[in-house]
């Protein structure tokens, strides 16, 4: 069981790396498709697994971009893990709409709040539209894919969460 879960975590992390390489230019930086595999993992494998994939996915996306924000990416990875974890918990409770809306809003408006203090309000304001677009795209892709992939994942794996 552990080796199967580890293999699935590696698979979703690899999907996250592929998504991180697909970038759409945005106002500040770019929008990547690195989060939707984490949302898939959170819904299919459990919130702990999704959190791991979310943190790794962001770090891989930052690595591909050359870590433009330096050590701030560690904070962002932790934020991403937390947001994906909350998404997974709510999704598991069959609150899919709440999970999706909360993820989009928190990833867009709450996660970049530290940048107000580190950079300035102008940087935060410039970042928000890009994050909103990216969050919506990643969440919609995940919501479309989850029901289709649920039939492919064996029932003994579904929501057998990873302990953090």
Q: Would you name each region that the model predicts?
A:
Residues 1-164:
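Loop-helix junctions at membrane interfaces
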């Amino acid at each position: 069981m552990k080796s199967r879960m580890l293999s699935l975590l590696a698979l979703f992390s690899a999907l996250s790396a592929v998504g991180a390489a697909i970038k759409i230019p945005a106002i500040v930086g770019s929008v990547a498709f690195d989060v939707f595999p984490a949302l898939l993992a959170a819904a299919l494998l459990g919130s702990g697994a999704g959190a791991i994939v979310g943190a790794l996915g962001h770090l891989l996306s930052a690595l591909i971009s050359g870590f433009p924000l330096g050590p701030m990416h560690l904070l962002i990875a932790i934020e991403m893990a937390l947001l994906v974890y909350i998404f997974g918990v709510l999704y598991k409770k069959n609150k899919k709409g709440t999970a999706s809306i909360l993820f989009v809003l928190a990833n867009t408006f709450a996660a970049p709040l530290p940048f107000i203090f580190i950079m300035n309000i102008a940087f935060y304001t410039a970042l928000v539209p890009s994050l909103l677009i990216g969050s919506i795209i990643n969440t919609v892709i995940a919501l479309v894919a989850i029901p289709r992939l649920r039939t492919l994942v064996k029932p003994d794996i579904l929501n057998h969460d990873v302990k953090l």
